Amino acid sequence: GGVYFLIVLLVALLTGLFSKNASFLFWGGVPYAAYLLLLNALPFVYGEGKTDAAVLKGIVKEAGAEKAMVYAMEIYGELSEGKSFSEIDEKYYFDLPQLPEDEPMYAMTLDLRYRYYVEKGDMKNAADCLNRLAASAQYLPQAQFDEVAAELVYMHSLNKDTERAEESGKLCKEYLGKDTAQAKRILAAYCAMLGKTEEMKALKTQAENCLSREDTEGIKKFEKILLSRLCEA
């Protein structure tokens, strides 16, 4: 809200130097922008989420969801610096209170823990995180639901559970059809389970090519680690 207000106000002032008519159009948006600014200045929680002030208040008080958000930001910051998930201090994954399933940070925290565990090779705890995510499917946005289903294909493939891998795959066909390293890695694991070595190698190569487009060095390192394990299988 605050950023929107400042942008509209600045544009209105600048256009006034050149055109009164154009400036009038932008000045018309200032009251609504000011309303958003004031709305976000109050620590309220609405159906669409928390206002900026409510989030800030939670951070100051180290409330569960806000603490999880700050820790997630720290994790992604370190991923950008080149650390992989398992190389980041585990306190950012686990030094958190229990969150309710309908809290968005609940799913994000479990997703980060899953990646931490799977990179370390702790497949039991990784599977537990995925299963808990699947159990909270009703609260997940579609994109995250698809990603969870795709990672379930990966886990079931590693466990040689063809039936469950195929069931999970039916829930995320479009996601697995994407030209991403994650999708190719999951399909490669599925082919490895079926003994389709040549298809697995081809998909691994495609995944490695996709990684050239990955901007986050830590995620690139993570995917390379998982791909290397497929070669060992």
Where do the model's predicted regions map?
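Hydrophobic transmembrane alpha-helices and their immediate loop junctions
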Residues: 1-233
